[in-house]
Amino acid sequence: MDSSRARQQLRRRFLLLPDAEAQLDREGDAGPETSTAVEKKEKPLPRLNIHSGFWILASIVVTYYVDFFKTLKENFHTSSWFLCGSALLLVSLSIAFYCIVYLEWYCGIGEYDVKYPALIPITTASFIAAGICFNIALWHVWSFFTPLLLFTQFMGVVMFITLLG
């Protein structure tokens, strides 16, 4: 492989700066330079797309047709699993809003997962544990439909949060 082709591949892979290329030239790899187009950053996908709109709409439909809030109101004080799931969901949503509102919007830290690597796993674990607790608490109401209904609700919440940040 000739040096100019190797340099192009290296530039594409690691996006070398021009001064790094000058150091490569000083090491004895002098050859004809070929011009390469600067890679453009890809546009991020829009936050509200068909996929997120579907989950939010499905969550609203499930909430309406299965009397979700009425069922939650009736089972609020009868099950400790429901209270535990509510606390875990509150922890998960609090961390998510802390990341989105405070770290990203207020402090301007776009890469908060790099600066605070423990936040994402803690949020994910508490969200999954909340889902398990809600499944146990509401199993007697909807039986084997409970995981499907709660998954639809959780996906609606997740897609709604992604609209914010």
From Swiss-Prot:
Organism whose genome encodes this protein: Homo sapiens (Human)
KW Transmembrane helix (keyword) present: yes
A GO CC annotation given for this chain: membrane
Cellular localization per UniProt: Membrane
Keyword Cell division: no
Name under which the protein is recorded: Transmembrane protein 128
Matches recorded under PANTHER family: TRANSMEMBRANE PROTEIN 128
InterPro entries per UniProt: TMEM128 (IPR033579)
Keyword annotations from UniProtKB, A to Z: Membrane, Transmembrane, Transmembrane helix
Major site of localization recorded for this protein: membrane
Pfam families per UniProt: TMEM128 (PF20479)
Transmembrane segments: 49-69, 81-101, 119-139, 144-164
